[in-house]
Amino acid sequence: MERLELDEKCTPKLECMISGLPSVTSVGMASLLPHRELQVDEKLNVTVDGQSCGDLASRDKILKAQNENNVALSFDDLINANQERLRELLQGRNIVYIYHNQVDARGDKPASENEVFKACEEAIEEIHRLVHRLTMYLSAPKFFITADHGFLYKRDKLQEYDKVSYDREICTCTNKRFLITTQRTKD
């Protein structure tokens, strides 16, 4: 945050919001799209007003249904684009969602999950550079930067008392970080 505050063209403001549970990308990304209803199946596939939203093309379609001048793009497409390409992609747009995936890419893999805080720092720096480029090349006046979900992180190895024992046969969804069941938990 301090680094962003040093940028005279930046007025950073940090606020928290309520997140959907479980705290996973598929639920969080869907929550940030315009919608009347979200539905989640037992495999954590999420639909927004009945439409799939599991990839960039689907999210773009959902945004365009609200306004044909809305668009969903990937961070990589924009960060590597020259000024002409940026204008082509963004000129005349109403709302632009830019998806950046570095934190998930590193945090979801056991070999690199201990790098998640470093990935967050790098993501902030990369997004700040992109915002600077867009401001310079396109005179884009306002940016809202969000995260699709937070993360629960424990630096130390989990102890047995940190774990919950549950019959996986009655779970509708299991994951290394959570499980979903229709059964009540025991205290």
Model-derived segments and spans:
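Feature captures the catalytic ectodomains and active-site-proximal regions of enzymes
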Residues: 1-187
